[in-house]
From Swiss-Prot:
Pfam families: Arg_tRNA_synt_N, DALR_1, tRNA-synt_1d. One of its GO terms (cellular component) is cytoplasm. It comes from Pelagibacter ubique (strain HTCC1062). Monomer. A motif ('HIGH' region) lies at residues 132-142. Its main location: cytoplasm. CDD domains: ArgRS_core. GO terms for molecular function: arginine-tRNA ligase activity; ATP binding. This is Arginine--tRNA ligase.
Length: 577
């Protein structure tokens, strides 16, 4: 039950009725009409801008239109306690208690689907996220994007969309060659006591390579490690496979499971790069040309070479992009073109890419080529996961993958746990940098958002245990009378915002809205709980050690929303803390 959508429908029906009898003119579109959450300083439950939308078409001020509508709206609904106009033309509505009685009955009966946005057209989504090079375990920079992609998937699944989660394995090119060489030298170090060439800056010096090397030795799939050239092909496959095992384990410990891993090597060897480029050629979007020196590059040192270029400027990019170098080898971008063509061939309605902050500049070229191949400007949506700053002992902790002293996902989980990692990483918009403070995430206070929300659920669970009920079971209470006051209704109004939160999180792909909402709801509940220390009427367990049915239903509704939100975020709701 989305009270905002229900009331919007009522208002639209009313103004169309007024238009039909000649009392009111309508604009070309009513899409601008909304029913929303009023500011906290207004004593009302919902607010609508309908008068402002109708003002121009009727050549009257919004306040005049509002004054015409308020009596008509009130006459249409006996559950309205008060209705008023406020500048510049809002109509504010406050409901009688009976409205909230019906509201809580409705969502208690249909709690599993409460919040689902039935207005959204159901689609098939392919979400690609993480896609870190398979050259070692995941670090904190990957962690935020991984959680972002996973929770966006959960939100879309909650709204009944068909979602596939994919990891693109960049297992082709020089980085993989250098990674495999690093493993080779670690194997030589173990078998023949040869010193690892640490001075070679192209190699990966991390200690995790020792574990990968030992596993490859134990597999007995390569028997001789005399020269790298003799074993490079088989060793590359084994090294990438072992690295992916580490990555999949990292993701599993974060609560993330991908549906598919797509290999860049497979894309290249299946000649998909050439096929994708041929499609662009057919559209006359490829030509041979030269690229000028990039900004900041010395023109004197830049050598212009004839290359195969994609006309990405036709789609708003700042320059055309190279697909094939002068030596006829494909660029990294060409492989990406082929991969996205591969995605398009699988007939998804919408593609979503979660990119790290270092790939933000890559967005325009890849959205351009997807538009070129699909003819749909909105086919691909890219979300950027900004940097994470780790704070330890009051100081920033820096990481460097090349030096091998970076903080891994495993380090983070070992320090604060899976739940804290997921919740805190999601607690701010992905568009801004995040400070991850190790001290705060361990506190048992309102400064720790995860603890505050989990404690809300645990407190409610304690009341259910007191009356020998399992909070996870449905309540079979049919005969109950409501006696809610303004303090309870304040919480119910917050509960009423849940569908709006889900709608915004889904349409804008902004999952941080979920933990922010859960924290606000929990804060309202904790405040109410604390009132019971002074006010007997606010206590859930009365002097006779019993709880009224209306309070029990009230608690159940709160706990259902908390549980639903925490499931989307992917964290536990403990019944005891």
């Amino acid at each position: 039950m989305n009270i905002f959508d229900l009331y919007l429908d009522k208002i639209i029906i009313l103004i169309k009725k007024l238009n039909k009898d000649g009392s009111l003119e309508l604009p070309e579109s009513l899409n601008g009409v909304n029913v929303d959450i009023p500011p906290s300083n207004f004593d009302c439950d919902i607010s609508t801008n309908v008068a402002m939308v109708l003002s121009k078409a009727n050549k009257k001020s919004p306040i005049d239109i509002a004054n015409i509508l308020i009596e008509l709206i009130k006459n249409e609904d006996e559950k309205i306690e008060s209705i008023s106009a406020a500048k510049p033309g809002f109509i504010n509505i406050k409901f009688k208690t009976i409205y909230w009685n019906n509201f809580i009955k409705s969502i208690n009966q249909n709690h599993k689907d409460y919040g689902v946005n039935n207005k959204e057209k159901k689609q098939k989504y392919l979400i690609e996220f993480v896609s870190a090079n398979p050259t070692g375990p995941l670090h904190v920079g990957h962690c935020r994007g991984a959680i972002l992609g996973d929770v966006i998937s959960n939100i879309l699944i909650f709204n009944k969309h068909d979602v596939s989660k994919e990891y693109y394995v960049n297992d082709y090119g020089n980085q993989i060659l250098n990674f495999t060489k690093s493993v080779f030298f670690r194997i030589r170090e173990i078998l023949f006591n040869e010193k690892f060439p640490i001075e070679n800056s192209d190699l990966y010096p991390g200690d995790y390579l020792v574990g990968i090397a030992k596993n490859i030795i134990k597999s007995n799939k390569v028997l001789k490690f005399d020269k790298f050239e003799n074993v490079s092909k088989e060793l590359t496959l084994l090294s990438v496979s072992e690295s992916l095992k580490l990555i999949k384990n990292n993701l599993s410990n974060l609560g993330i499971v991908h549906d598919r891993f797509t290999s860049e090597t497979d894309i290249v060897l299946n000649n998909e790069v050439q096929k994708a480029i041929d499609k662009l050629k057919e559209k006359k979007l490829v030509y041979s040309g030269k690229i000028k020196a990039p900004k900041g590059e010395d023109d004197e040192n830049w050598v212009e070479r004839e290359q195969l270029l994609f006309k990405s400027t036709d789609f708003g990019d700042d320059k055309d992009r190279a697909l094939q170098k002068s030596d006829k080898s494909w660029t990294y971008f060409a492989s990406d073109v082929a991969y996205h063509d591969n995605k398009l061939n699988r007939n998804y309605d919408t593609l979503i890419n979660i990119l790290g902050a270092d790939h933000a500049g890559y967005i325009k070229r890849i959205t351009s080529v997807v538009e070129a191949l699909s003819g749909d400007k909105k086919k691909l949506i890219c979300k950027v996961s900004q940097l994470v700053k780790l704070i330890k002992d009051g100081k920033p902790f820096k990481m460097s993958k090349r030096k091998g002293d970076y903080i891994t996902v495993e380090d983070l989980i070992a320090e604060v746990g899976k739940d804290a990692t997921r919740f805190i990483m999601l607690n701010r918009s992905s568009d801004v940098e995040l400070d991850f403070d190790f001290t705060k995430v361990k506190e048992k206070s309102k400064d720790n958002p995860l603890y505050y929300v989990q404690y809300c659920y645990a407190r409610i669970s304690s009341v259910f245990r007191h009356v020998n009920l399992n909070i996870e079971n449905d309540l079979n209470i049919k005969d109950y009378e409501f006696a809610y006051t303004g303090d309870e209704i304040k919480i119910l109004k917050k509960i009423a915002e849940w569908p709006k939160c889900i709608e915004a999180a889904s349409l804008r792909l902004e999952p941080h809205r979920i933990p922010v909402y859960l924290y606000e709801l929990s804060s309202e509940f904790h405040s109410y709980w604390n009132m019971g220390k002074e006010d007997q009427s606010k206590r859930f367990i009365n002097e006779q050690k019993k709880i009224s049915n209306d309070k029990l239903v009230f608690l159940k509704v709160i706990s259902n929303v908390i549980k639903s939100g925490m499931d989307i975020v992917g964290v536990d709701t403990p019944q005891k803390m």
